[in-house]
Amino acid sequence: MAESYLLEKLKSVEQTFNELTRRLGDPDTAKNPDEYQKIAKSRSSLEEVVETYDNWKIAQEELIGARQVLKEANSDPDMHEMAALEVKELEEKIDYLETRLKVLLLPRDPNDDKNIMLEIRAGTGGDEASIWAGDLLRMYSRYADTQGWRVKLVSESLGEMGGFKEVILEIQGESVYSKLKFEAGVHRVQRVPATEAGGRVHTSTATVAIMPEVDEVEIHIDPKDIEMTTARSGGAGGQNVNKVETAVDLMHKPTGIRIFCTEERSQLQNKERAMQILRAKLYEIKLREQQEEVTSMRRSQVGTGSRSEKIRTYNYKDSRATDHRLGQNFSLNPVLEGDLETVIQSCISQDQQERLAELATSSAAG
């Protein structure tokens, strides 16, 4: 039988769902398109919970019937065997539905539906680290393509031998943060660099930060804390190149965060873009502090988002990508080609199990 806290929550969700369904059918609601859309979205977010709860209730009724048949079939071995099998199958189905309901009722991360800024910084390993940062950029761009997301380069600092010392992408689409938040941390590569004549295996790293996009209301920046200079933006040649100062070099004095933006066409656009990146960076710092508090309580293995956490090692010699949080190996080439869905879904699943265990502990204590 499901825990009482779960049943209470499910009854409450069902009542809310029925009320939203009633309001959608109200002619007055239909007159206000914004209100109608808002209610429809709220109702849609509860649909899977209510459907799963209905299936659970049906399975409970069927189980009562199957147990009754089992009780009455003692004199008929064949009927007894069939009824016993049905009871077993229904009990397994109910267990599965209860676990699914618990997952569906876990509190949603308020940032899950947000677009993101994805920052990759070359770490230890010199030129090879910059090349590795470029490989990660390609991996995430390809993964974004498979998801139907839009990717735009917003800031870059090129490496001397290729790749990037630092690069920031804007990624927009459905559920971007909910999936890519598990990619934050240190990505380590072990391979023979193209720059290495001796053929020795080197270890290099790059750090990935996942920053949900935020508006001015969520993160307020005091203009007095900003120091901004302009510079001439490099270009592909022609009459106007380097004559107009469109590039923006922005410094946030309290944190020392510095952003250089050249990708947009005008100085105003570059300033707006730099402020957008700064807001995302400040929000990510705030989130990280909150997550570290939660992590110290949960001792979570997945999704802490810590920049210093080594999350994955890509070993070229063994054609293996090892995710250290999961303790699992994946085939290297598909991962580098952007086939990240299996890895990310495994991280999501482990995070859910961790949170379910926490929920069970707190419910037992309560």
Curated annotation (Swiss-Prot):
InterPro entries, A to Z: PCRF, Pep_chain_release_fac_I, Pep_chain_release_fac_I_sf, Prokaryotic/Mito_RF, RF-1
Keywords assigned by UniProt, alphabetized: Cytoplasm, Methylation, Protein biosynthesis
Similarity comment: Belongs to the prokaryotic/mitochondrial release factor family.
NCBIfam families: prfA, PRK00591.1
Pfam families: PCRF (PF03462), RF-1 (PF00472)
Lineage of the organism: Bacteria, Bacillati, Cyanobacteriota, Cyanophyceae, Nostocales
Compartment(s) of residence: Cytoplasm
Species per Swiss-Prot/TrEMBL record: Nostoc sp. (strain PCC 7120 / SAG 25.82 / UTEX 2576)
Free-text function comment from the UniProt entry: Peptide chain release factor 1 directs the termination of translation in response to the peptide chain termination codons UAG and UAA.
Protein name: Peptide chain release factor 1
Gene3D superfamilies, sorted: 3.30.160.20, 3.30.70.1660, 6.10.140.1950
Modification(s) after translation: Methylated by PrmC. Methylation increases the termination efficiency of RF1.
One of the record's GO molecular function terms: translation release factor activity, codon specific
